[in-house]
Amino acid sequence: MESSNLGGGGGGGGGGGPPPFLIKTYEMVEDAATNHVVSWGPGGASFVVWNPLDFSRDLLPKYFKHNNFSSFIRQLNTYGFRKIDPERWEFANEDFIRGHTHLLKNIHRRKPVHSHSLQNQINGPLAESERRELEEEINRLKYEKSILVADLQRQNQQQYVINWQMQAMEGRLVAMEQRQKNIVASLCEMLQRRGGAVSSSLLESDHFSKKRRVPKMDLFVDDCAAGEEQKVFQFQGIGTDAPAMPPVLPVTNGEAFDRVELSLVSLEKLFQRANDACTAAEEMYSHGHGGTEPSTAICPEEMNTAPMETGIDLQLPASLHPSSPNTGNAHLHLSTELTESPGFVQSPELPMAEIREDIHVTRYPTQADVNSEIASSTDTSQDGTSETEASHGPTNDVFWERFLTETPRSCLDESERQESPKDDVKAELGCNGFHHREKVDQITEQMGHLASAEQTLHT
């Protein structure tokens, strides 16, 4: 019944019936056998082409004698169909509805519109509003273009800066590697040059301490010697226990490069200070080896042979102190060693003639004058002794008491005297220039006898 109506409508197409394209399209969509390819949409107000390939291969040749899907879509557009779903091929028209074939006659083919007639229609009242919209769109596009151009310039500038920073970092990395190699090379060279001098100086100090063959005693504190030994040991610590190189940090930014450069600069300064300290130690060692006495602890024998002008505060051990009970034994032992030592020179006894010449008597004084002169000489000697004691300070009283009560002995044996002639000269001067207290008392008694003899001759 429906097909007959469609046929009647098609037969009367010349008298205002629906076009054949619309009739064939309606029959194709209405066929239930092809619903998997094309079918009505939800509600029957549209149709959907589910499989365009099968539609072009099977249905179009059957109904329209061609297989061009695009041509079929253009035909739909000429009859006023529109695509209502962008995700699929679904088309609709207000008069193309399922079960309402009588509405197909209301669908007409659009006539082609020429460009001249279209321009004439556009030049109406819609031209101003459309122009304003276009101008706004143009201005918006220009603004967006300017933003994009500025962003592009900024990106190019950042890229240039990044490339420059990368080149600078590569140059700094190469310079740091070269500086690190130079530091390692200079350190190796310094250790090779200075290691022998330091070891020899340490061996020499050990040799000096062993050659004395005297037990170590803390007689006095020598700050200068302690400072020099500390310098030597500090230099040895720098040479042998040098700090390890800092670990290589991952190069991520400029801060890591700055930290590495600071560490390299600190290492360079450290090695420079070590080199200066090593040079100073070498100069000190060369001066000490050339004749200067090394700054080591002085033994008790050197205290005896030290000259009076040095002003060194000498302190005796408890075993040799005059107040100790072993003073007599020590005096006997010192006297025996002094007489048996090869460098001993006995002080000659002064004859009466020389004693008379020392007094420088220009006239024969009276008994009162002699007594006053003896008293004045005694006071003068006491004043001189007090001035000497005051000049040397209270710390040298023990030394002078030992010097006046005990016989000094030489601290150097024959082999040491051959190696250090200066010490021999000091020992001989000490032995020949100092007299013990018994000799002084004897001279005083002789002076008393001389005074009495002069008094007798004068009377």
Swiss-Prot record:
<feature type="short sequence motif" description="Nuclear localization signal">
    <location>
        <begin position="209"/>
        <end position="213"/>
    </location>
</feature>
<protein>
    <recommendedName>
        <fullName>Heat stress transcription factor A-4d</fullName>
    </recommendedName>
</protein>
<feature type="coiled-coil region">
    <location>
        <begin position="127"/>
        <end position="189"/>
    </location>
</feature>
<keyword id="KW-0805">Transcription regulation</keyword>
<keyword id="KW-0175">Coiled coil</keyword>
<dbReference type="Pfam" id="PF00447">
    <property type="entry name" value="HSF_DNA-bind"/>
</dbReference>
<dbReference type="GO" id="GO:0005634">
    <property type="term" value="C:nucleus"/>
</dbReference>
<dbReference type="GO" id="GO:0006357">
    <property type="term" value="P:regulation of transcription by RNA polymerase II"/>
</dbReference>
<comment type="subunit">
    <text>Homotrimer.</text>
</comment>
<keyword id="KW-0804">Transcription</keyword>
<feature type="compositionally biased region" description="Polar residues">
    <location>
        <begin position="364"/>
        <end position="388"/>
    </location>
</feature>
<feature type="region of interest" description="Disordered">
    <location>
        <begin position="364"/>
        <end position="398"/>
    </location>
</feature>
<dbReference type="GO" id="GO:0034605">
    <property type="term" value="P:cellular response to heat"/>
</dbReference>
<dbReference type="GO" id="GO:0003700">
    <property type="term" value="F:DNA-binding transcription factor activity"/>
</dbReference>
<keyword id="KW-0238">DNA-binding</keyword>
<dbReference type="InterPro" id="IPR000232">
    <property type="entry name" value="HSF_DNA-bd"/>
</dbReference>
<comment type="similarity">
    <text>Belongs to the HSF family. Class A subfamily.</text>
</comment>
<feature type="region of interest" description="Hydrophobic repeat HR-A/B">
    <location>
        <begin position="141"/>
        <end position="191"/>
    </location>
</feature>
<dbReference type="GO" id="GO:0043565">
    <property type="term" value="F:sequence-specific DNA binding"/>
</dbReference>
<comment type="function">
    <text>Transcriptional regulator that specifically binds DNA of heat shock promoter elements (HSE).</text>
</comment>
<dbReference type="InterPro" id="IPR036388">
    <property type="entry name" value="WH-like_DNA-bd_sf"/>
</dbReference>
<dbReference type="InterPro" id="IPR036390">
    <property type="entry name" value="WH_DNA-bd_sf"/>
</dbReference>
<keyword id="KW-0597">Phosphoprotein</keyword>
<keyword id="KW-0539">Nucleus</keyword>
<keyword id="KW-0346">Stress response</keyword>
<feature type="short sequence motif" description="AHA">
    <location>
        <begin position="397"/>
        <end position="406"/>
    </location>
</feature>
